[in-house]
Swiss-Prot record:
Localisation per UniProt entry: Virion; Host nucleus
Species the sequence originates in: Psittacid herpesvirus 1 (isolate Amazon parrot/-/97-0001/1997)
Protein name: Small capsomere-interacting protein
Family the entry assigns: Belongs to the herpesviridae small capsomere-interacting protein family.
InterPro entries (UniProt xref): Herpes_UL35
Signal peptide start-end: none
């Protein structure tokens, strides 16, 4: 059914924008596109696939990953590059400007200016003591 919904929209011309938006309009088409993206090898991804992934949501990605984990047997070669494809899809989702607007990170970024802001958000200097005391200074004492 997802192929018929993609074939019904020839208005996109070369298919770079029209096919992705038509696939996004139907119910499970974004999840199906994500499953196809996650199943293909990372070297064979097309720019159209990458643009379609950037238009999907994080909920679609988690649903696609759940579907793949239940469908794939343990010896399947797709499991070898599933982690790389998931990382690529997450980076595409993070760079999408639509998701940046939904997250509204500006007030949080304003609070994170300076070391006091990082301290209040739980990044402690005790986790990296080499920043406070370089080895050259400790040898001179």
């Amino acid at each position: 059914m997802s192929t018929s919904s993609r074939q019904q929209s020839p208005a996109g011309g070369d298919g770079s924008t029209g096919g992705g938006s038509a696939a996004h309009c139907s119910g499970h088409a974004p999840v199906n596109a994500l499953v196809e993206f996650l199943r293909t090898a990372p070297r064979t991804h097309t720019p159209e696939q990458l643009q379609a992934i950037a238009r999907s949501s994080i909920n679609d990605l988690s649903e696609a990953l759940r579907a793949l984990r239940t469908d794939l047997p343990k010896g399947d070669p797709v499991r070898g590059f599933l982690r790389a494809n998931t990382t690529l899809a997450l980076s595409l989702l993070n760079h999408a400007p639509r998701l940046r607007e939904q997250l509204n990170i500006q007030p949080v970024a304003a609070r994170l200016t300076g070391p006091q802001g990082f301290w209040s958000f739980g990044i402690r200097q005790r986790n990296r003591p080499q920043i406070l005391r370089p080895p050259q200074l400790s040898r001179k004492k």
